[in-house]
């Protein structure tokens, strides 16, 4: 069973969840239009940020226009395709059944597709992380990434909220993170209600999405993207025959949803007859003229992040943070603050 188990694809799950959310940036009309758009350029009308609005201190009979400037955002598509074949006669007198082999092939190919789509979602977050921080609190940033020293690892989850709020994103926050952040949250959970210090507020108001495709740079142990709710989405489109659900010359096209991937993808099925004697070695040596089934799945994907016409001056809803690694075999210490240090001599209580 462990040869086909999936990992967590938190970035992909996050984009899909946000696409289906009530406050999604993707309208049902855009979703339907995109699905059948292959062969066309899809553009989304948007309105640019206007920093030139003037507030007057006098009344006047002449009211300024304050017109908006519109633009068109062209969707960028990436194609993903997977597939496998089956030779039905090969399962006669075989310990592995047709259904067993089919399910394993379906699982491994869709797992590979889910992993590729998850990597694409992480890349979209990376490309759209904010370049603007109204405040960094007590942190530094390098390359638009917040650098969290080891001593402040227990504070960054809580500090993400005021950093986001200062950037005018008070919405609740999603964290797309890796195992290092999971480890940190579990340590904070040991200091919950009725314990020495209640650290639940650091992480309680976050929605957590884990993926191994958020990777740590050297000397880091924990990387995450914090994203304000309602600011990302994902669009798919299928080939024309899949949308038409064509049946012709023993070929069949359709639109389906695969395991692990709650997105519409195009499917293509057909059969052919040929020499299948080499497909499974001696077990199929006699299949010099046999039927082979072909199962193919493909989809075009566009990752969307809320439009920003002035990324160098207007904050994006995505913050990336990296936590510095501790030395090996060194535990994470919780900070201890001495509030009455002035009552003790310089050398300590026993000096």
Give the residues covered by each predicted segment.
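Ser/Thr- (and often Asn-) enriched beta-sheet segments in non-cytosolic proteins
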Residues: 41-43, 74-76, 83, 145-147, ...
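Pocket-edge structural micro-motifs
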Residues: 46-48, 177, 293
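Alpha-helix boundary/N-cap detector
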Residues: 6-7, 100, 104, 108, ...
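Hydrophobic/aromatic-lined pockets within catalytic cores
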Residues: 12, 16-20, 110, 114-126, ...
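Long, contiguous amphipathic alpha-helices that act as assembly "spine/axial" helices in icosahedral shell
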Residues: 71-137, 175, 251, 279, ...
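N-terminal "assembly arms/tails" that initiate or stabilize quaternary assembly
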Residues: 1-75, 217-222, 313-351
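Extended, solvent-exposed, turn-rich assembly/linker loops in the middle of proteins
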Residues: 130-207
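Sequence/fold signature of self-assembling virion shell proteins
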Residues: 5, 148-151, 186-351
